[in-house]
Amino acid sequence: MNETQIQRETRQVVEDVLEKTNLKQGALFVLGLSSSEVLGGQIGKESSQEIGELIVETILGILGSRGIHLAVQGCEHVNRALVVERQVAEQFGLEIVSVHPTLHAGGSGQLAAFKFMQDPVEVEFIKAHAGLDIGDTAIGMHVKHVQVPIRPILREIGHAHVTALTSRPKLIGGARAHYPQDAIRKF
């Protein structure tokens, strides 16, 4: 698999999703990543530290330039805990948990986050504003309600299926209520 191509596809997808979601500075963005799927393997079976680092470093650069915070979801072996910067955990009141990821418990994306973040910690749960799922890792539990699917410009990064979610406020009030224009869904 060509690393330049994976980096280019990652950049394209992330920039497209950010454009479609219109996230503001300070937002939380969750990443689910299967490096095995990127390489054409089965999720959790052929993890690649190099691919994890390439993708996470690329995404951190893009989000960091916009002031958006990255949370990297781990696999079920760490109860889908997430790596964030300690400052983000404190700012959002997130519960820090005690676990350090490995290649096969947490995964390559979490290991990369520990390598490239300034002061990484694991947290149990978040409610992100949006997120990207590379390899069908199931990020929905970490995106706040109401979740809105986003169709990325590319359907795959490497060989991994790619999906994205954003969120919007709940519509409440019933038939007599009026709602502001929504940037994601037009009423």
From Swiss-Prot:
<dbReference type="InterPro" id="IPR006340">
    <property type="entry name" value="DUF436"/>
</dbReference>
<comment type="similarity">
    <text>Belongs to the UPF0340 family.</text>
</comment>
<dbReference type="InterPro" id="IPR028345">
    <property type="entry name" value="Antibiotic_NAT-like"/>
</dbReference>
<dbReference type="Pfam" id="PF04260">
    <property type="entry name" value="DUF436"/>
</dbReference>
<protein>
    <recommendedName>
        <fullName>UPF0340 protein SPD_0576</fullName>
    </recommendedName>
</protein>
